[in-house]
Amino acid sequence: RESLASGHVIDITTTGRRTGEPRRIEIVFHNIDGRLIITGMPRADHKRAWLANLEADPNLTFHLKDAVKADLPATARVITDAKERRIIAEWVSANAWKGQDVEAMTAHSPMIEVTILDPVLA
């Protein structure tokens, strides 16, 4: 649980929406009031493959890889609600990526909420 208490660099493995093959990437998560949130830098011109994979299949593996190493089964919920996206963007801009453009993040950053399926950690 302590490893999930604050944001870290992690890996996630998704299932390729076209190939069905596992796809592992490195990414950062944030713990925002007990919610595990993954977001990326805003890009209006590009949809991330990992996000498209999670839209097709919300199951993923959340890989802790710092002091604690664990492969945690999880599910993702893509965050689409504008108010919810703005709250997350404001938190990230104030606490993690200082000064990031809140408007750009709200409009163009990928955002998902992760639910860990391991009952000990959930």
List the model feature ranges, each with a label.
Residues 43-120:
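Short, structured beta-strand-loop surface elements
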Residues 4, 19-21, 54, 106:
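A generic structural micro-feature
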Residues 1-8, 101:
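Extreme N-terminal tail/first-helix region
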Residues 1, 10, 31, 35, ...:
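Generic alpha-helix detector with strongest preference for long hydrophobic helices that associate
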Residues 7-43:
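Short beta-strand segments
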Residues 1, 16-18, 65, 103:
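Residues embedded in well-ordered secondary-structure elements
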